[in-house]
């Protein structure tokens, strides 16, 4: 029945074309033979043949003045590579065709192109899409369609906008299927998308073989597949995928236009198996001409709908007719080859018309049914693709991809101007995914074969982080510690379940690649990242240097001099003399207690000044000015004595703990031994810093480290210990009264969880680490494992000095300078007042000529004698019992 239908179609085409050609023939028209190589007997070929005929009919009807007419010569390739080559040879040798339209497949075209190159006959294929058929192979090959690599950018941007990090290509095992892989791989690598493995399916594979390949996919974690194959193989693959459970929720399938462009040719059962698939479809701008052509085709061939083959065949035929018209009618002959002792291919005649025709084809430009039509380097170039979602028996448009804007919901000018990636909802309309769900697949999940993640746990030095014990009853291995609890919290914070099992091991390098992950106190290092992937760090970073503390204060019999600097001692002593002298000047003329023999006055002066420091002096101060000076000095002495007492108390009672070393440079220069944690990368860091092997001492426990530090280098110990900051926190929690972290000489990224390179878990676990770190859970875990440590000593990273050294500072003159300036000012003003009053009182001596030559002597005598005219003296003379009231201790108990 199928062959009968094909024969009917061919007769119909020949009849129609013969009528058209007969009507247009006259003596001025040159008939040009062209060949058509196709697989007669398929729906796609029949549509193409009908479109070719309609194209010629429309072309010559609209251009009756044309000087040429194309005469089609059909040849059946019989869906075979050799058959296509034989058909092309026959058309060139026997029909002397000037160009060939076809063949249909990539494999056929590869051979036919060689034939066209030999005979200089242009080959125009409207369905061979493999990038392997590069027009650079032959200037006589023209691809009247888009090559498969033109859609890889659209595919990669779909993958990127959904946040998928791994994809598995599933493609046909031939030149057509493999042709897209180089371009697809490059496009995915450019955006850091990993291809962990590939699935290659033979076009001749049985259903059982297809099922086996699909079952292998189920055992892998990746759930995003890019499918590139012909529609016949794709229908079988998706039928088996539905049977094996690969079309359930959580899976994502992306189809190339090799299948999506031909959905109209597929039956309902095949399309139903593809529910939820998204794909790339060639975009054809809607036009009146396209709608008219669709209606005409439906009337002429009602058994099928218009597909890409029909449009491409129509435009390719129009382009060939225009090129022939442009090339003219000269040099239509073939140059015959000597056929003796050579093969049929070598004996091909060479078309003299070919060079002119390819030049004309390269220059052709017009607006066809499929859009703007113009060959660039022998190919058409795509600028827009449609993104479709296979739903309800067809493809629903959900967006577009354009060369300028990337993924957009529509082609309106307001849809965006730059290729920016945000939420997929800003780029595409809602999509129904496999499993009939709107939830976007995350792109991977733990394989459905029941296997648990094998989590390696390195057994370390500090049990607070990882501790491995064995249950005495069940003999079951029990793994605990801060790292383990933190990992469990991270797993709970992830959006899906991850079944896992902890397996302790003794080496944390992770090079064996036996485990699915490593969880423990494993430090993130650059050299390790070359063979594993790390998550974000979940602890503080750095390698700390821990050194002993010692009391550096030497206590002697002269320690009471240390609170004050020599400058302050000198200023204080000098101030006592100055204040005593000023008070004597102000008081000796009005206060009898400051008079008497010179020796008595001098002793009284200094006695008064120094006695202020310990008790109230017995000498009373009478003048107001002197009282101001004394009160000021009282305040200064009070401040000085209180400060001195506090400083001396601190010096006598507090240990002055200072680190024995302050930097790694000092330790390296002194040449003493240092300790490091055994089996740690710290050993390499110390070697790089210049420490010789003989000076490096390993320790296996905090107790051993403390023993080495306590002994010191002189007794077989070490001068410093180097360990990672999290370990320092634990160590100082036990011994912070004796040791201190003084420096972080090496920067590292802290502890992280380890996964194989490319593991899709890394990004999800890192995001979960951030969630836990920002929640109360992290604080609760730290409290549970380090609460006793934090009570004993602060965190060395939050407080880098868990044992702040009580560094003694002597009291200096700078601290009290303002007080001494105030005292000096008061004394100066008091003296100035006294001098002015004294000069006014004795101005007669200064002005009277009687005292000429003896004024200084008289003034001195006046200065030294008592001032009986002063207010104080007059009050004392009238009320001596009030002003001179003896103190009780001065009264003789016998004589009264």
UniProtKB/Swiss-Prot annotation:
One of its GO terms (biological process) is calcium-mediated signaling. The keyword Protein biosynthesis does not apply. This is Glutamate receptor 2.4. Expressed predominantly in roots. Glycans are attached at residues 26, 46, 53, 204, 267, 331, 341, 527. Residues 25-565, 642-815 are extracellular. Belongs to the glutamate-gated ion channel (TC 1.A.10.1) family.
């Amino acid at each position: 029945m199928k062959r009968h239908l094909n024969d009917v179609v061919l007769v119909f085409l020949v009849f129609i074309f013969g009528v058209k050609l007969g009507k247009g023939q006259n003596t001025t028209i040159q008939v040009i033979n062209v060949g058509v190589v196709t697989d007669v007997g398929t729906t796609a070929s029949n549509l193409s043949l009908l479109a070719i005929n309609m194209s010629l009919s429309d072309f010559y009807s609209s251009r009756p003045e044309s000087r040429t007419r194309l005469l089609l010569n059909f040849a059946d390739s019989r869906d075979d590579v050799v058959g296509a080559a034989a058909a092309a040879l026959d058309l060139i040798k026997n029909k002397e065709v000037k160009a060939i339209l076809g063949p249909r497949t990539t494999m056929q075209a590869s051979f036919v192109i060689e034939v066209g190159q030999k005979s200089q006959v242009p080959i125009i294929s409207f369905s061979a899409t493999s990038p392997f058929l590069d027009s650079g192979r032959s200037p006589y090959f023209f691809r009247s369609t888009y090559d498969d690599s033109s859609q890889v950018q659209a595919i990669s941007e779909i993958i990127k906008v959904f946040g998928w990090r791994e994809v598995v290509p599933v493609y046909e095992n031939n030149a057509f299927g493999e042709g897209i892989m180089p371009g697809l791989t490059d496009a995915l690598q450019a955006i850091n998308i990993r291809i962990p493995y590939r699935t290659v399916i033979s076009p001749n594979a049985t259903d059982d073989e297809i099922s086996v390949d699909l079952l292998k996919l189920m055992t892998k974690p990746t759930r995003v597949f890019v499918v590139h194959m012909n529609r016949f193989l794709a229908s079988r693959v998706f039928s088996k995928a539905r049977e094996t459970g690969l079309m359930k929720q959580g899976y994502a399938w992306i189809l190339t236009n090799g299948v999506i462009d031909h959905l109209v040719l597929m039956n309902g059962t095949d399309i139903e198996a593809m529910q939820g698939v998204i794909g790339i479809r060639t975009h054809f701008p809607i036009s009146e001409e396209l709608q008219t052509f669709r209606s005409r085709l439906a009337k002429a061939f009602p058994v099928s709908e218009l597909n890409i083959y029909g449009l491409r065949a129509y435009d390719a035929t129009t382009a060939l007719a225009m090129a022939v018209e442009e090339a003219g009618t000269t040099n239509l002959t073939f140059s015959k080859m000597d056929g003796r002792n050579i093969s049929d291919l070598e004996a091909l005649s060479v078309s003299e018309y070919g060079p002119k025709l390819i030049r004309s084809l390269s220059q052709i430009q017009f607006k066809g049914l499929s859009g703007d039509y113009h060959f660039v380097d022998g190919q058409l170039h795509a600028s827009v693709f449609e993104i479709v979602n296979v739903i309800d028996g067809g493809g629903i448009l959900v967006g577009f991809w354009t060369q300028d804007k990337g993924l957009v919901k529509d082609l309106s000018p307001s849809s965006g101007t730059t290729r920016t990636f945000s939420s997929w909802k800003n780029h595409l309309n809602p999509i129904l995914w496999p499993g009939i769900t709107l939830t976007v697949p995350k792109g991977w999940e733990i394989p459905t074969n029941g296997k648990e993640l094998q989590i390696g746990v390195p057994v370390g030095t500090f049990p607070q982080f990882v501790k491995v014990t064995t249950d005495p009853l069940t003999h079951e291995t029990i793994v605990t510690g801060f790292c383990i609890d933190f990992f469990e919290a991270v797993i709970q914070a992830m959006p899906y379940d991850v079944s896992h099992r902890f397996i302790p091991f003794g080496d944390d390098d992770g090079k064996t690649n036996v485990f699915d992950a490593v969880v423990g106190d494993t430090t993130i290092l650059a050299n390790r990242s070359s063979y594993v992937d790390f998550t974000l760090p979940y602890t503080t970073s750095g390698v700390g240097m821990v050194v002993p503390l010692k009391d550096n204060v030497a206590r002697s019999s002269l320690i009471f001099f240390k609170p004050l600097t020599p400058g302050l001692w000198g200023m204080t002593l000098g101030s006592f003399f100055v204040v005593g002298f000023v008070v004597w000047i102000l008081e000796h003329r009005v206060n009898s207690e400051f008079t008497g023999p010179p020796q008595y006055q001098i002793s009284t002066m200094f006695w008064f000044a120094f006695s202020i420091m310990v008790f109230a002096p017995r000498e009373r101060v009478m003048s107001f000015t002197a009282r101001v000076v004394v009160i000021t000095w009282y305040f200064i002495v009070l401040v000085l004595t209180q400060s001195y007492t506090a400083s001396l108390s601190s010096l006598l009672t507090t240990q002055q703990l200072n680190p024995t070393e302050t930097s790694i440079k000092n330790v390296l220069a002194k040449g003493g031994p240092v300790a490091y944690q055994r089996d740690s990368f710290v050993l390499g860091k110390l070697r790089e810093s210049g420490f010789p092997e003989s000076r490096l001492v390993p320790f296996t426990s905090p107790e051993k480290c403390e023993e080495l530090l306590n002994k010191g280098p002189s007794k077989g110990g070490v001068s410093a210990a180097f360990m990672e900051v999290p370990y320092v926190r634990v160590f100082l929690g036990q011994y912070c009264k004796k040791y201190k972290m003084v420096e972080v000489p090496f920067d590292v990224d802290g502890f992280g969880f380890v996964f194989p390179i490319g593991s899709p878990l890394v990004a999800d676990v890192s995001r979960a680490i951030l969630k836990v770190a920002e929640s109360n859970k992290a604080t609760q875990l730290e409290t549970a494992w380090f609460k006793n440590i934090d009570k004993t000593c602060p965190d060395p990273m939050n407080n880098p000095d868990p044992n702040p050294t009580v560094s003694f500072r002597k009291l200096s003159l700078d601290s009290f300078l303002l007080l001494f300036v105030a005292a000096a000012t008061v004394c100066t003003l008091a003296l100035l007042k006294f001098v002015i009053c004294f000069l006014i009182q004795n101005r007669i001596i200064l002005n009277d000529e009687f005292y000429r030559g003896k004024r200084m002597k008289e003034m001195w005598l006046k200065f030294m004698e008592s001032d009986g005219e002063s207010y104080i003296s007059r009050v004392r003379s009238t009320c001596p019992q009030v002003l001179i009231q003896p103190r009780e201790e001065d009264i003789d108990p016998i004589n009264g």
